[in-house]
């Protein structure tokens, strides 16, 4: 067997093959973006008929029916109550983020909500650095700065007063980022299915308590029932399908597919709710996406090179 040839300068090293495109992964991602769009539209429809917190309660009730099917299989893991304080903290943050996001969906153009939601990778990086000690690369710092510019383009502070609901959506993206960091820590001791079951079991009483305090229960109309089913089922399917996509396909391919949510929801908002298609919102969304995608792609490439040479 010939002796291995020493690696030459970095520029002479053979290029790594591009990540493979998986047909199954693409289909899973299309299911995910369809679920997120369905959840937003159903939330908008229900927000005209009932309080936001009631939407979250009904969403959790649908989730509880699904969790009941999983509970017998997961009971041995559930009864150990491992890391319960972390589950509780994660769901307090996630519940608040869901409330802010749903309120944003009710009050803002849907495309603006989705554009601002794409700032979540910024918050994940910052919270992972603060809570888990993960290193923030220079390109990630640059992505955070450019993403902030994209946020300013979306919000257009010079064009008048910023809608407070837009700040709520930014806060929800931060909350989802913090929740993702909690999930990253929880996966050391709990399966994804158990994390989802705990989410339903904890967030349902949170919603019921808040609903009792506000006294805002409104009896659903028959026309609301399909939207209740959609908002509950898509809340589960959106995250499940994305997890399945990322299991079989590189994130650098999956995330651009997910970004199609922004132009698609802009068209739906225009057709269904007469929302104008804003060039500033779309351009700002592209800036936010491009910054985070470039950083993610560079970091993934660095990891692949490290594995290839290690």
Predicted features and spans:
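Membrane-interface interhelical linkers
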Residues: 1-34, 64-89, 138, 201-229, ...
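C-terminal-most transmembrane helix of multi-pass membrane proteins
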Residues: 2-8, 263-310
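Hydrophobic/small/kink-forming positions within alpha-helical transmembrane segments
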Residues: 33-41, 68, 91-99, 121-126, ...
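Specific transmembrane alpha-helical segments of multi-pass solute transporters/efflux pumps
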Residues: 35-38, 75-112, 153, 233-248
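Transmembrane alpha-helical segments that form core, pore/gating elements
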Residues: 37, 41-44, 52, 67, ...
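C-terminal transmembrane-helix exit sites in multi-pass transporters
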Residues: 103, 120-142, 263-282
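Hydrophobic transmembrane alpha-helices of multi-pass small-molecule transport proteins
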Residues: 139-155, 172, 280-299
């Amino acid at each position: 067997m010939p002796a291995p040839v020493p690696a030459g300068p970095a520029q002479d090293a053979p290029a790594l093959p591009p990540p493979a495109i998986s047909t199954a992964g693409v289909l899973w991602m299309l299911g995910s973006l369809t679920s997120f769009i369905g959840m937003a539209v159903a939330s908008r429809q229900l927000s005209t008929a009932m309080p936001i917190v009631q939407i979250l309660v009904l969403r959790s009730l649908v989730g509880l029916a699904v969790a009941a099917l999983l509970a017998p299989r997961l009971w041995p893991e559930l009864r150990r109550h491992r890391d319960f304080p972390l589950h509780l903290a994660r769901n307090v943050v996630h519940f608040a983020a869901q409330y802010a996001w749903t309120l944003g969906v009710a009050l803002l153009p849907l495309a603006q909500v989705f554009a601002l939601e794409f700032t979540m990778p910024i918050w994940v990086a910052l919270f992972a650095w603060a809570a888990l000690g993960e290193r923030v690369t220079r390109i990630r710092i640059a992505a955070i700065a450019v993403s902030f510019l994209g946020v300013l383009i979306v919000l257009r502070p010079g064009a008048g007063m910023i809608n407070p609901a837009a700040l709520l959506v930014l806060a929800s993206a931060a909350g989802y980022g913090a929740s993702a960091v909690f999930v990253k820590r929880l996966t050391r001791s709990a399966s994804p299915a158990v994390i989802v079951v705990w989410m339903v079991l904890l967030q349902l009483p949170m919603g019921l308590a808040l609903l009792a305090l506000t006294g805002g229960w409104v009896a659903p109309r028959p026309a609301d029932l399909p939207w209740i089913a959609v908002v509950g089922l898509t809340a589960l399917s959106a995250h499940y399908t994305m997890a399945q996509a990322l299991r079989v396909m590189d994130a650098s391919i999956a995330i651009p597919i997910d970004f199609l949510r922004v132009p698609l929801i802009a068209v739906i908002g225009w057709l269904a709710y007469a929302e104008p298609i804003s060039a500033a919102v779309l351009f700002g969304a592209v800036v936010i996406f491009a910054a985070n995608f470039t950083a993610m792609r560079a970091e993934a490439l660095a990891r692949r090179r490290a594995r290839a040479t290690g």
